[in-house]
Amino acid sequence: MANIPLLQCIQLTKYYQRANFLIKVLNCITLSIQSNEMIAVVGASGSGKSTLLHLLGGLDKPTEGEIFFEGHALHKLTDNERSVIRNKRLGFVYQFHHLLSDFDVLENVAMPLLIGGIAFNQAKSRAQCVLELVGLKNHINSFPHELSGGESQRVTVARAIVNNPSLILADEPTGNLDQKNSDSIFQLLKKLNTYYGTTFLIATHDLDFAKKCHKILMISNGKIKLSQNDSFR
């Protein structure tokens, strides 16, 4: 029997009303993502990469089409219902880390757990374990302004995985990093994928980064083309 997809969209369409005309960003996209996959999403600026991630992550609703995540029909859920799923089963990493400046690294990473109602000591213990996993055990009491760009992005990754999500959606996670830090972040994501089974969908302009993923999803003119990367490394 075929594996049930972790995430699936069927005939997904998204357009925006602008004055007297419509801007169609995504047009009848059908896509299935299996557990443990690491997929890069590439395309020109404005092609719809971020829009696709927002829809698949339940941050926005499609104009038409269906989205299923772990058996949940996201397109049918209320905003509050989608919010609960996002906090418990999804992780997000962005180009800009959006760390809370008044909180230290440990508190920033623990925040999703605290929002989810986890006890303070349990949340901090889990956050500390995750920070050790991403190589930041010596920075748990540091504040965001004391971190380098690469360290800040590692904190963002730690915050994204602290709830042990089955899927992480990353939007240009290395966009503000130099090549050395970009390579370091990729190796971190690959480790999480290989050893912990985390599934990744990563929007990127970096074709070298994309070529290191299992599959590459190209968006152009609102359509997608998915290719297998046989040289995954």
Curated annotation (Swiss-Prot):
Name by which UniProt lists this protein: Lipoprotein-releasing system ATP-binding protein LolD
Compartments, record wording: Cell inner membrane
Assigned keywords, A-Z: ATP-binding, Cell inner membrane, Cell membrane, Membrane, Nucleotide-binding, Translocase, Transport
Biological process per Gene Ontology, one example term: lipoprotein localization to membrane
Database matches in Gene3D superfamilies: P-loop containing nucleotide triphosphate hydrolases
Source taxonomy: Bacteria, Pseudomonadati, Pseudomonadota, Gammaproteobacteria, Enterobacterales
Assembly: The complex is composed of two ATP-binding proteins (LolD) and two transmembrane proteins (LolC and LolE).
Chief location category: membrane
Keyword Transport: yes
Biological function: Part of the ABC transporter complex LolCDE involved in the translocation of mature outer membrane-directed lipoproteins, from the inner membrane to the periplasmic chaperone, LolA. Responsible for the formation of the LolA-lipoprotein complex in an ATP-dependent manner.
Recorded GO CC terms: plasma membrane
Top-rank taxon: Bacteria
Membrane topology category: Peripheral membrane protein
